[in-house]
């Protein structure tokens, strides 16, 4: 029988717990797939067949040793601002909807989500479902297709995850269970306390109290830990702490920043800081303009804050400037919107590249890619072949600059400004090495290349989970 992991709130660790359970089951020889009916995130991933899903479900698929598919996250909401989100349905753009209108769509979306869930059950047998946000959002019970409505339809065991680091864990757990609709309360079969710091023995009486209050077994207390797993959403940026390393990289924290998981390998070898629009860019060795859900609006915000002048000043000082996806579009001369990405009009770009971009349709390019870096730059020259994925609206006229990658991107004559549509570029060790080696050498510092073949983080996660959680009790839930 499948099971469902729900939370007392957002950011309690549901995604990671699902990934841990998936890897633990796979290591026992049990085939399992992850599923989240509805996710809201600007960090997304492109499946092999060109569908877009949340990065968390891709991560969970990897934990289950599967290739991600669109059925694992049939509904993805990508916030655009002004209480409006783009709805991605079964991997492809469905429509932009205000929140009030979205709830009119939930019966149809739930039907599609249940069909996707059914296909996963048919193929894999076992499915670990992840809820969204807090399970006890009482004002949404009649339309919450990620928690209550879904749980009522599926009727499968629920495991509740709570974050003790925030404080108030007793109220979190007790309140969530008591506020669940009466038919769902008996489905709560276990509780996991996550992000514990210190000696767990101190919390032994806390476990007893929670079990007495709720009548539900505490399956385990998971310590606070750090593993190189992809971040799910913008809440995670606030948790990032840059390392005290000699090379500093500024990633512009655009208002609608997306796919900042692109830089998580760099974070291990450089002081990567997410600098908000208006923040100082002085003293950085490299500036990266990342992807964004709203290129034109974020370019306007960047300009209003004066960050455009800081970027242009850094360029004059010989600081590398790199644009990824929407950041690549911003680096160009012009952006023309026919009313599909933002308000219709023509907007000047930063002018660091000669390219120009037009948003002429609502369609989106989504595909996995393999590219060869052009040996025309002191940074690109040693990258070689790299892989990644594209998720973007708009078509770019490349202009007169040199090609940066085979079939993608542009680079200036001196090689210090380049843009690409390729998300995941710097998750390639060769690409991260190429950039870091250049930056370290420029400061006359020795750089040691990234060592590949390190321990699988999902196995490390599973080992930690097994150490602190009663995994046999979870397996028993599946067997009922």
Swiss-Prot record:
- The answer to whether keyword Nucleotide-binding applies is no
Indicate the residues that form the catalytic site. 325, 423
GO BP term, example:
cobalamin biosynthetic process
PROSITE patterns of this UniProt entry?
Answer: GATASE_COBBQ (PS51274)
InterPro entries assigned: Class_I_gatase-like (IPR029062), CobQ/CobB/MinD/ParA_Nub-bd_dom (IPR002586), CobQ_GATase1 (IPR033949), CobQ_N (IPR047045), CobQ_synth (IPR004459), GATase_3 (IPR011698), P-loop_NTPase (IPR027417)
Q: Which GO terms describe its molecular function?
A: ABC-type vitamin B12 transporter activity; catalytic activity
What does the record give as its pathway? Cofactor biosynthesis; adenosylcobalamin biosynthesis
- GATase cobBQ-type domain location: 246-431
Keywords (A to Z) from UniProt = Cobalamin biosynthesis, Glutamine amidotransferase
Provide an example Pfam family for this protein. CbiA
Tell me the NCBIfam families matching this sequence. cobQ, PRK00784.1
- Describe the task this protein carries out: Catalyzes amidations at positions B, D, E, and G on adenosylcobyrinic A,C-diamide. NH(2) groups are provided by glutamine, and one molecule of ATP is hydrogenolyzed for each amidation.
The record's listing under HAMAP family reads:
CobQ
Q: Which family does it belong to?
A: Belongs to the CobB/CobQ family. CobQ subfamily.
What is the protein's given name? Probable cobyric acid synthase
- The scientific name of the source species is Methanoregula boonei (strain DSM 21154 / JCM 14090 / 6A8)
